[in-house]
């Protein structure tokens, strides 16, 4: 009877033949990619037109940003594997991404060029660099772990796993396709803040979706040792919050 009850419980947590957790990850990643590619579509134009970077300096910054974005998931995955767990890592990454994208929407004064001398708003640039750093860290924590959660939703050798990942990657493509058009159009038509703000709102929608739907992850994304996370490492600060602060 217990096996039958367990099977019935598992089936009640499915939708269209897949775990409901897949759709939670689908929409979370769709909105994360919406925000990521929406911001990326504007970045070079923002640097060269608003802050008057040269093309070379703009490409150099984007190259450094791209390199760090693809390097940080190694660290984010390791931290989640050893301490945080995938669920907490995705939430933390989502919060960083929301803050980073909304920070990008804060406009200062556009740069000016007089006699070949470029004057830039130093405070606006500081906010920009800090926001970019938040996005890099956010991607590092969210991207590798949400993909791993999808795999954990299926038992070993489950024939549905391949189609589940196909659906998941379809969400990535949908988010990337829509954002490049929408955020680019908003940025060019109404101002940079509108384009970056739309990317931030998209990520906020993804984070809200994940937080509300995390009950469908079937406990597969929890910390490996919850008690260790609650240990105090200095003063009242627990290991979990020490990780957040260190990031």
Where are these regions (language model features)?
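Intracellular loop-helix junctions on the cytosolic face of multi-pass helical membrane proteins
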Residues: 1-20, 156, 184-247
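Cytosolic juxtamembrane N-terminal segment immediately preceding the first transmembrane helix
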Residues: 1-33, 37, 112-126
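Cytoplasmic loop-to-transmembrane helix junctions
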Residues: 20, 24, 57-58, 92, ...
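A gly/Pro-rich, aromatic-decorated transmembrane alpha-helix motif that marks the paired
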Residues: 40-41, 74-78, 106, 174-189
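Short amphipathic helix-loop junctions that connect adjacent transmembrane helices
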Residues: 41-61
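Central cavity-lining transmembrane alpha-helices of secondary-active solute carriers
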Residues: 63-82, 98, 143, 177-179, ...
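Cytoplasmic membrane-interface "Motif A"-like loop-to-helix N-cap segments
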Residues: 82-98, 158
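C-terminal ends and interior cores of transmembrane alpha-helices
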Residues: 92-123
